[in-house]
Design a protein with these regions (language model features):
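A general marker of short, structured functional hotspots
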Residues: 5-8, 20-22, 71, 122-124, ...
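Long, hydrophobic, amphipathic alpha-helical segments used as structural scaffolds
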Residues: 17-20, 24-28, 71, 93-97, ...
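Long, positively charged binding patches that form subdomain-scale interaction surfaces
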Residues: 31-119
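Long, charged low-complexity segments
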Residues: 101-171
Length: 171
């Protein structure tokens, strides 16, 4: 499909898929079984609005790709890429490429009025990826990360990215 028609084609196909009660939709040009409109919108908005944050954008697209790979889905790496997208955005916004996520969140909390509860929630989510099944570190055993885990992380991280980008655009 030519690029000029791609967006219209995807919208048309998604309308047909929804009308026929299909369990699939296109999200960022990838066929996936994410069908909830809010989840799709959150992921697509994060991908589209993170274009100016290339590291974030690359990680989000990789997370979606790992999640939707029909031949060999890689849920562990989808989770890793989802949280890495958040980390990349926060580090970029902090202005310190060597900053940790915690230091970056402190900077964002001060400069963009990030609520302490949001900061704590994200820190906890990041901790989950550091501790559980070695998601971000060397695997010791076979991963127990499921599709639901990976989808949750992609949608949640996309929502957080949308929130932070929205907060910085308000200032």
């Amino acid at each position: 499909c030519p690029n000029s028609l791609k967006k219209d084609f995807i919208e048309f196909v998604n309308i047909v898929l929804e009308k026929e009660l299909s369990a699939y939709r296109f999200v960022d040009e990838q066929l996936t079984d994410i069908t909830d409109e809010q989840e799709i919108e959150s992921i697509e908005t994060a991908i589209n609005s993170s274009n100016k944050f290339s590291g974030t954008n690359i990680h989000l697209k990789a997370a979606l790709s790992f999640l939707t790979d029909r031949n060999k889905p890689d849920y562990r790496n989808s989770v890793k890429e989802s949280i890495s997208a958040v980390e990349a955005l926060c580090v970029t916004l902090s202005g310190d490429p060597k900053a940790t996520l915690g230091a970056s969140l402190n900077s964002i909390e001060k400069s963009h009025s990030l609520h302490p509860a949001f900061k704590k929630a994200l820190t906890s989510l990041y901790g989950y990826t550091s501790d559980s099944d070695g998601i971000r570190h060397a695997l010791l055993d076979e991963s127990t990360i499921s599709y639901s885990d990976a989808k949750y992380m992609l949608v949640s991280c996309s929502a957080f990215i949308n929130y932070v980008i929205g907060k910085i655009s308000e200032n």
